[in-house]
């Protein structure tokens, strides 16, 4: 159905894959159903046609479809596929007219030239950021691209945008989709800041500090800078904005949809959950890379903190998409309760995750507080095998210092911070239980895990890395 190469008039081949997916802008894999698309959009269109799917749009039928939010509205995604010419009856590349092939060749050449120009323009700070993950320790997240700053997992890259401007990222991986993560190629990203906090010069008031005293060696301006950076990074890397979550709040899975989840095989639902978790983890990795203090840690410690803490941050972020009024969580575009996950065969894990989310919601945390608490959970000096634990500890102390005074500003309850810190053992316990359940599942379904689970998910929760991930 696809033809991935164009023979040039001179020598060699020009890769169609250099042209981004016409639907979502992700790394393309060739011509599918008549249009240059990624594997994710190809699979989405195929499933839609096979199932004669009829989708509805929860908004105004004009949703933006891009790499980040392509899974949010199936209706608008399918309409974009059709509008751009995707069809079961589309001709293959080999049957294109000479004019069509020449036009496609010209577009490939144009993209290749643009990419080459962008590579030549990279220098200074952009180059330093792009090479921060430059060495190779062993495998997985530690096997890192020396050219572009992408984070590898068994040869598959997490595509992480930089904080501003244009960057050319040689990404070995598209964003997670139903089709998995196994892709290679080039992705150009322009990161548009969503939230501008630079004008907030005094995020904290001096009156909120204990007797107006700062910890030794810590300045007010430094705490303010760290807090603004973390909060901005959090807001820009959440899967859903609070406005979107409010719009979706009462869109719950129907009885028929819940029964469909319950009737799935255990392995099918495990795979779906693994894909969703992997998607969430990619946002967490991007969040971490935007934290100034995190990027100043040595590469080894960055990797260890991500491997051991990314799922814990996903669990903290889960409270944003949890409705404590009816005990439901956002899953695949709608809210559903614990009964949706019966087929997993892990009721205790599901119960503990839901209980934690409900308890965290009861603290009524603001986005500022969730941002700072998430970063404090991630940047923990207690992780095993850190090379510079003292440096990690100093950064975490500054984050907690900022969190303490945001809480004092927002809450009458002086015990809120203590309550948050007391929840960290629960976070760790839930994540450890997830690891145990995964290993039990893997023992009975090794082929499913090895062939169908996302590579990043397998790498992060590999039992061989248990000493690191605790």
UniProtKB/Swiss-Prot annotation:
Residues 18-93 bind DNA. Gene3D superfamilies: Erythroid Transcription Factor GATA-1, subunit A, Retinoid X Receptor. GO terms for molecular function: DNA-binding transcription activator activity, RNA polymerase II-specific; DNA-binding transcription factor activity; melatonin receptor activity; nuclear receptor activity; RNA polymerase II cis-regulatory region sequence-specific DNA binding; sequence-specific DNA binding; sequence-specific double-stranded DNA binding; zinc ion binding. The keyword Transcription regulation applies. Isoform 2 expressed with circadian rhythm in eye and pineal gland. Isoform 1 expressed in retina cortex, thalamus, and hypothalamus. Disulfide bonds: none annotated. InterPro entries: NHR-like_dom_sf, NR_DBD_ROR, Nucl_hrmn_rcpt_lig-bd, Nuclear_hrmn_rcpt, ROR_rcpt, Znf_hrmn_rcpt, Znf_NHR/GATA. Changing residue 457 to A: Inhibits transactivation activity. SUPFAM superfamilies: Glucocorticoid receptor-like (DNA-binding domain), Nuclear receptor ligand-binding domain. SMART domains: HOLI, ZnF_C4. Keywords: Activator, Biological rhythms, Developmental protein, DNA-binding, Metal-binding, Nucleus, Receptor, Sensory transduction, Transcription, Transcription regulation, Vision, Zinc, Zinc-finger. Residues 104-117 have a biased composition (Basic and acidic residues). A motif (AF-2) lies at residues 456-461. Residues 222-460 form the NR LBD domain. It comes from the Eukaryota. Monomer. Interacts with CRX. Nuclear receptor that binds DNA as a monomer to ROR response elements (RORE) containing a single core motif half-site 5'-AGGTCA-3' preceded by a short A-T-rich sequence. Considered to have intrinsic transcriptional activity, have some natural ligands such as all-trans retinoic acid (ATRA) and other retinoids which act as inverse agonists repressing the transcriptional activity. Required for normal postnatal development of rod and cone photoreceptor cells. Modulates rod photoreceptors differentiation at least by inducing the transcription factor NRL-mediated pathway. PANTHER family: NUCLEAR HORMONE RECEPTOR HR3-RELATED, NUCLEAR RECEPTOR ROR-BETA. Belongs to the nuclear hormone receptor family. NR1 subfamily. This is Nuclear receptor ROR-beta. It comes from Rattus norvegicus.
């Amino acid at each position: 159905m696809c033809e991935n190469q164009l023979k040039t008039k001179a020598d060699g081949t020009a890769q169609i894959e250099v042209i981004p997916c016409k639907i979502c802008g992700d790394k393309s894999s060739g011509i599918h159903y008549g249009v240059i698309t990624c594997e994710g959009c190809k699979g989405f269109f195929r499933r839609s046609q096979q199932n004669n799917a009829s989708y509805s749009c929860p908004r105004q039928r004009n949703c933006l479809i891009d790499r980040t939010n392509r899974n949010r509205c199936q209706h608008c995604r399918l309409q974009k596929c059709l509008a751009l010419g995707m069809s079961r009856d589309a001709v293959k590349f080999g049957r294109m007219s000479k004019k069509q092939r020449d036009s496609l060749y010209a577009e490939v050449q144009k993209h290749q030239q643009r990419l080459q120009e962008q590579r030549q323009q990279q220098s200074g700070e952009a180059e330093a950021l792009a090479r921060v993950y430059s060495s190779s320790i062993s495998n997985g997240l530690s096997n890192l691209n020396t050219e572009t700053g992408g984070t590898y997992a068994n040869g598959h890259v997490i595509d992480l945008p930089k904080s501003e401007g244009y960057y050319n990222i040689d990404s070995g991986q598209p964003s997670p989709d139903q089709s998995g993560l196994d892709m290679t190629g080039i992705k150009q990203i322009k990161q548009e800041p969503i939230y501008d906090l630079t004008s907030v010069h005094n995020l904290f008031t001096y009156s909120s500090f204990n007797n107006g005293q700062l910890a030794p060696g810590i300045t007010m301006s430094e705490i303010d800078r760290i807090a603004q950076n973390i909060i901005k990074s959090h807001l820009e890397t959440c899967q859903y904005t609070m406005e979107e979550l409010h719009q979706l709040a009462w869109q719950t899975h129907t009885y028929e949809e819940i029964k469909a989840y319950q009737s799935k095989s255990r392995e099918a639902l495990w795979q779906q959950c693994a894909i969703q978790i992997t998607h969430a983890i990619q946002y967490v990795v991007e969040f971490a890379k935007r934290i100034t203090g995190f990027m100043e840690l040595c590469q080894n410690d960055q990797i260890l903190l991500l491997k051991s803490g990314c799922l814990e941050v996903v669990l903290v972020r889960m409270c944003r998409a949890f409705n404590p009024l009816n005990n439901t969580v956002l899953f695949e575009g709608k809210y559903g309760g614990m009964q949706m996950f019966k087929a997993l065969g892990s009721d205790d894990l599901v119960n503990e995750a839901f209980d934690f989310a409900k308890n965290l919601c009861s603290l009524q945390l603001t986005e500022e507080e969730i941002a700072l608490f998430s970063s404090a959970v991630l940047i923990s000096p207690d992780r095993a095998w850190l090379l510079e634990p003292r440096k990690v500890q100093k950064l975490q102390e500054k984050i907690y210092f900022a969190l303490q005074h945001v809480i004092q500003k927002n809450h009458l309850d002086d015990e809120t911070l203590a309550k948050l810190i007391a929840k960290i053992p629960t976070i760790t316990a839930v994540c450890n239980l997830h690891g145990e359940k995964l290993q039990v599942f893997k023992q009975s379904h090794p082929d499913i895990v090895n062939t169908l689970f996302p590579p990043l998910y397998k790498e992060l929760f590999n039992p061989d890395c248990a000493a690191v991930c605790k």
